[in-house]
């Protein structure tokens, strides 16, 4: 089975204050990703977040990229590395943009999250991954679930295998806009808030990955360090 390593941090990391979640994972060997389930720490605050004021339609994202979507739909950004099977493994680097997708319902506990993955060399490809951030406010913590299709290098060819992925969820590097007195004014949105209390050893997090060609799943567990002071 592939080995998976998970890392997560809050920046800044003050209790009950807006933060940006930085999360990343690495896989020991290239495999075609099928499912991703990220569990956030219990107690993350969503009530005061202003992330995702507007929605981005998947059809618009596929046709025009993130630039075709409202700036106020962006949730985060990052990068990915995949490996392309050839005579030897060839690394493919890609940019990642996370955006708010169409509403998943009126319960207020689920958000659709779209990941736009843009690779340029050696394979020129753009992929939209559809995910759901659910269980917002749940005692056990919210979860981010994403599914990915097989990604062959060419028709009937071998699949691209994801080996590294990192992304943010939060205001770091984001600029939103609003109308004030008829003028368009830029502002930084509020992110999710760091839990008020930190358990001994840090906030528990986990990541479960599944692959198309591998039976079963692998779960990586970690801890986010408690805020200082």
Q: Would you name each region that the model predicts?
A:
Residues 1-229:
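Ser/Thr/Pro/Gly-rich, low-complexity intrinsically disordered stalk/linker tracts of secreted
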């Amino acid at each position: 089975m592939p080995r998976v390593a998970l890392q997560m941090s809050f920046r800044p990391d003050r209790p009950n204050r807006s933060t940006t979640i930085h999360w990343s994972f690495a896989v020991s060997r290239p495999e075609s990703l099928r499912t991703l389930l990220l569990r956030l720490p219990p107690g993350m605050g969503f009530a005061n977040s202003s992330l995702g004021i507007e929605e981005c339609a998947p059809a618009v994202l596929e046709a025009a990229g993130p630039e075709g979507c409202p700036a106020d739909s962006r949730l985060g950004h990052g990068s990915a590395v995949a490996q392309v099977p050839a005579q030897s493994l060839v690394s493919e680097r890609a940019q990642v943009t996370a955006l708010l997708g169409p509403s998943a319902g009126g319960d207020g506990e689920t958000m659709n999250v779209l990941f736009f993955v843009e690779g340029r060399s050696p394979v020129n490809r753009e992929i939209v991954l559809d995910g759901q951030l659910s269980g917002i406010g749940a005692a056990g913590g919210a979860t981010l679930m994403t599914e990915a299709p097989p990604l062959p290098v060419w028709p009937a060819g071998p699949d691209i295998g994801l080996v590294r992925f990192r992304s943010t969820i939060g205001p770091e590097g984001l600029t939103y806009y609003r109308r004030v007195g008829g003028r368009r004014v830029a502002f930084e949105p509020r992110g999710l808030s760091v839990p008020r209390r930190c358990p001994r050893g840090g906030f528990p997090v986990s990541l479960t990955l599944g692959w198309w060609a591998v039976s079963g799943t692998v779960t990586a567990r970690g801890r986010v360090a408690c805020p200082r002071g």
